[in-house]
Curated annotation (Swiss-Prot):
Domain Guanylate kinase-like: 4-183
Keywords tagged on the record: ATP-binding, Cytoplasm, Kinase, Nucleotide-binding, Transferase
Reactions mediated catalytically: GMP + ATP = GDP + ADP
Annotated organism of origin: Mycoplasma capricolum subsp. capricolum (strain California kid / ATCC 27343 / NCTC 10154)
Protein name according to UniProt: Guanylate kinase
EC number: 2.7.4.8
Family of this protein: Belongs to the guanylate kinase family.
Gene: gmk
């Protein structure tokens, strides 16, 4: 049986991790299990021990750290949070994927220690909306809300440490994005093509219809500019059409994950508009696109 994977869904407090995960867990094709965290904070109204959290004392939490019973842990606003190791490892062996709904500090620990991980950072649409969501819970005073917002300002720049950055503008849109990411990563039982694969077909159509002149010139340019044997070999084997299609597909996909209506990725006019802007950023005189992973691309 293929081993499951730890799926980190992290982001600042109030971004909506719980709401998104609750919807994801309803889909049996995702093979998801929820890792119940351990915490020293008091239960909120409606929270159940062993379901929402394992509520423990400070002494019990400290003992779990000493005994290496936690995959990660963090301390914040006078409380401690951690992920019990035993349950996660049991579910992974069964072939299930385990959601770790954790704060950014804990996610950083897991990313530094564990290899079998898929990491997703949930972004709020803006800081005003984040503040509204935290206040909407009506569980904390203004001092604690301010502390959470201050921490969010430090956490959001760390989003680049994650494999995927996904905006939670509304739960349905965020769930659709994460579902496709899990499908793309081969972690589901879904049989239909991914949105990414269907997007790639649309991009291929657009490139063939509108950009083959640039493709052909690109291949010619890199051959003419090759200065040494290594560059000449790269130029000789350079398939500009395939490279451009994959490059544009990845950039359009990730841009919409980060902001936008996910269903638009199957709208040819929308994709065409995105590609028009991206084409200005490509260096048609080099095989290497040094700014490829840059947000400015």
């Amino acid at each position: 049986m293929k081993k499951g994977k730890m799926i980190i869904i992290s982001g600042p407090s109030g971004v909506g991790k719980g709401s998104v995960n609750g919807e994801l867990l309803q889909n049996p094709d995702l093979r998801l299990k929820y890792s119940v965290s351990m915490t020293t904070r008091k239960p909120r109204n409606g929270e159940i021990n062993g379901v929402n959290y394992f509520f423990v004392s400070n002494e019990e939490f400290a003992k779990a750290i000493v005994n290496d019973e936690l995959i990660e842990y963090a301390h914040f606003v006078g409380n401690s949070y951690g992920t019990p190791r035993k349950y996660v490892e049991q579910e992974l062996k069964k072939g299930n994927n385990v959601i770790l709904e954790i704060e950014v500090d804990g996610a950083t620990q897991v990313l530094n220690k564990e290899a079998n991980v898929l990491s997703i950072f949930l972004m709020p649409p803006n800081l005003t909306e984040l503040a509204n969501r935290i206040r909407g819970r009506q569980t904390e005073d203004e001092e604690k809300i301010k502390a959470r917002l201050d921490k969010a300002l430090l956490e959001i720049p760390l989003k680049h440490n994650y494999q995927y950055v996904i905006e939670n503008d509304n739960v349905a849109n965020a769930v659709a994005k994460i579902t496709d990411v899990l499908h793309l990563e081969g972690l589901t039982d879904i049989k239909t093509p991914t949105v990414y694969e269907r997007l790639e077909q649309i991009v291929e159509q657009i490139v063939k219809e509108k950009y083959m002149y640039f493709v052909n010139n690109w291949e010619t340019n890199v051959k003419l500019l090759a200065k040494n044997e290594e560059e000449k070999n790269k130029a000789k084997n350079f398939d500009a059409e395939t490279y451009l299609i994959k490059l544009l597909t990845k950039k359009v996909y990730h841009k919409v994950l980060g902001h936008g209506d996910f269903s638009k990725l199957l709208d040819k006019d929308f994709v065409d508009f995105k590609i028009q802007k991206l084409m200005f950023k490509i260096n048609f005189f080099s095989v290497e696109q040094k700014h490829y992973n840059n947000d400015e691309f």
